[in-house]
Amino acid sequence: MPKFLHTADWQMGRAFTRFETEDGAALVEARFEAIEKLAQLANEHQCDAVLVAGDVFDAQTVSDRTIRRVFNATKAFTGPWVMLPGNHDAALAESVWTRAERLGAVPENVHLALQPGVIDLEPQRLSILCAPLTQRHTYGDLTEPFSSYESPEGFP
């Protein structure tokens, strides 16, 4: 039975303007520490993959530094990470995700689901059906295309 660590809504890059400056800065740092802790937990529990189901980033306009720090924080777990864009960080033609790729910030073990489809994790013999948000607001069933998909050869 596959073992996943499932998480979502990190909202990295969020500004905590309702708090005192020091407290806001501490909350920002705590979010990066939380990603590091998730990586540690994935190792401790021998997870097959970490699934991040939307809103890794709070906005398309986060800094390059924030983008790099997010992906650096994942490095302790060398197994696959699958990240799906959400409504805050939708997979637009030009997005925080395409910027992360241009920056070379995305490690090889991190799979970005920037369009609907299947991500095959061959060493783990897993296929992940991904339905990312490709626009900020959507009203249709993002999983509808999956009904016609067939399992890849050699996968259950």
Task: Give the role of each language-model region.
Residues 1-69:
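N-terminal active-site segment of His-dependent metallophosphoesterases
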